[in-house]
């Protein structure tokens, strides 16, 4: 995909075996698409940038800005180290004034009875967006709110920044995000997070939750 660059974010806190499994799944999904890896420890794949800042929501978006400025393609896609992707996820392209978010996302806890669940919300880990729009939005955000923890691009919740169009898209296959104790989310750190009401033990493409979660080790 010559019009897209993947920006892969990790602070290298996921289990080693998982990191290797995740890498194999991601590379199979993106093929020859260029990738920028942003990590706390050196990595030998993609164009690797090192970050030294403490993990935070604010820092996630600062690293995205670094990657977006380094990329040269019209679009960027975010990939996170606790989310499994498939090839169809990366085929969507929103208009140049719009943020795209994959809405077909299933969650899976790394504790308790392995169960897939669905929640209807956007996520940074599911974003595909025009590169220039990302740069413009984040430069405006950090100029006005340099230290504020602000969430997904396009929504700019709790700010007076200009909102931008967002659009959801639904590939036939769902992506999988894992909840774990090294997350920035306190409910995941304390294992108190609640599942969505739509739940399943098995879903197409990924198979049974009890088997998939075994890769988190």
Task: Locate each region found by the language model.
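Short, polar loop motifs at secondary-structure junctions
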Residues: 35-44, 81-83, 105
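N-proximal low-complexity "stem/linker" segments adjacent to membrane-targeting elements
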Residues: 1-21
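Residues at the starts of beta-strands that form the adenosine-phosphate
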Residues: 3-5, 32-34, 75
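Short acidic, S/G/P-rich loop/turn micro-motifs used as interaction or catalytic elements
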Residues: 11-16, 83-85, 134-136
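GT-A fold catalytic core of metal-dependent nucleotide-sugar glycosyltransferases
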Residues: 68-103
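Conserved catalytic core of nucleotide-sugar-dependent glycosyltransferases
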Residues: 90-216
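Active-site-proximal specificity loops/subdomain of glycosyltransferases
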Residues: 37-74, 88-91
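Short, acidic, metal-binding catalytic loop of nucleotide-sugar glycosyltransferases
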Residues: 20-33
């Amino acid at each position: 995909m010559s019009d897209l660059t993947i920006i892969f974010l990790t602070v290298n806190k996921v289990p080693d075996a998982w990191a290797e499994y995740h890498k194999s799944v991601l590379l199979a999904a993106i093929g020859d698409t260029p990738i920028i890896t942003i990590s706390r420890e050196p990595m030998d794949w993609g164009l690797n940038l090192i970050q030294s800042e403490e993990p935070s929501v604010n820092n996630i978006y600062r690293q995205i800005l670094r990657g977006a400025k380094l990329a040269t393609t019209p679009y960027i896609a975010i990939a996170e180290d606790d989310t499994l992707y498939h090839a169809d996820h990366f085929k969507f392209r929103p208009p140049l004034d719009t943020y795209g978010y994959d809405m077909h996302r299933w969650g899976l806890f790394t504790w308790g009875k392995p169960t897939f669940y669905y929640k209807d919300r956007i996520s940074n880990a599911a974003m595909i967006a025009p590169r220039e729009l990302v740069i413009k939005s984040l430069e405006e955000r950090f100029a006005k709110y340099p230290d504020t923890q602000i969430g997904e691009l396009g929504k700019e919740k709790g700010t007076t920044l200009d909102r931008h169009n967002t659009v959801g898209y639904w590939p036939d296959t769902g992506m999988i995000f894992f909840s774990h104790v090294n997350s920035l989310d306190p409910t995941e750190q304390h294992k108190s997070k609640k599942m969505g009401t739509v739940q399943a033990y098995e879903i197409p493409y990924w198979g049974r939750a009890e088997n998939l979660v075994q890769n988190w080790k």
